[in-house]
Structure formats: C-alpha cells, structure tokens
Amino acid sequence: MTDSAQSEAHASAALPLSVSARLGRLQFHLSGKFRVLQCADVQDGLRISQDTIRLIASACDAVRPDLVVFSGNQIAGYEKVFAKTFQRRRWQESSNISASDKKQLVDKVHEFVAKLMKPLEDRSIPWVVTYGNHD
C-alpha cells in the first residue's frame, strides 16, 4: 500500500459517523433526531470539480447525516458531451438516438454518480439521488 493510500485509509477510518452509519441501517437517534443532508443543483460536468467533492465531504463531516438526499440537477446535462442525447423538452419526440449513444450516456451518468457519491461511500452514509430537468 502506498503512503498516500495508507494515509487516506487511516483518515477515512477516523471520520465521524452518524448513528445510522455506525449501525449499518437507517436509525433514529435516542434523542429522536434523524439528520438529513440535502444537496441540490450541483450541476457539474463529467469532470466533477474537486471543490465540489471537498464541499460534500466537509458537509458530511460537519453534519454527520443519517441520510444524504441529492434532489435534482446534479449533472449539467446541457454540456456538449451530452449533445447527442439531450432533449430540450421531455414531451417532444427524441431524435433518433442510437442504442450505442444511450449506453454511452448511461455509462457516463454512472461514472458521474460514482464520483459524486465517493465521499458518502467512504463514510458509509446512505444516499439517494433524484434527477431533475438538467440530468
């Protein structure tokens, strides 16, 4: 294990955890509280900014949420990389989008979500994503 990987593993082991993260299931605190951190309108591209990742990580460390909800518009779907599959209006017929283009889009979205959720995965924090009109 490299020094940086070892340092990262040690740092993540020392992260503050919520009750839910410690128990491995969603759980109210004895006080009756349940902390939800909501994030919305990240609107980042496939090359997600490290500032965004650090902000999410810092918010999780400060709040120690039991659940993080990303409530729409995480992906800047209007970026050039999505041009082949972007629909301006959902109710309009899509142009002939190939199966290959659709698969590439799904792969890109999965890659983006994995990067965005890494701070939560590192902290064992449950999360949920809903998509918005830019995703």
Feature-to-residue mapping (PLM):
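Mobile, glycine- and charge-enriched loop segments
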Residues: 1-50, 56
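Core catalytic region of metal-dependent phosphoesterases/phosphodiesterases
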Residues: 46, 50-135
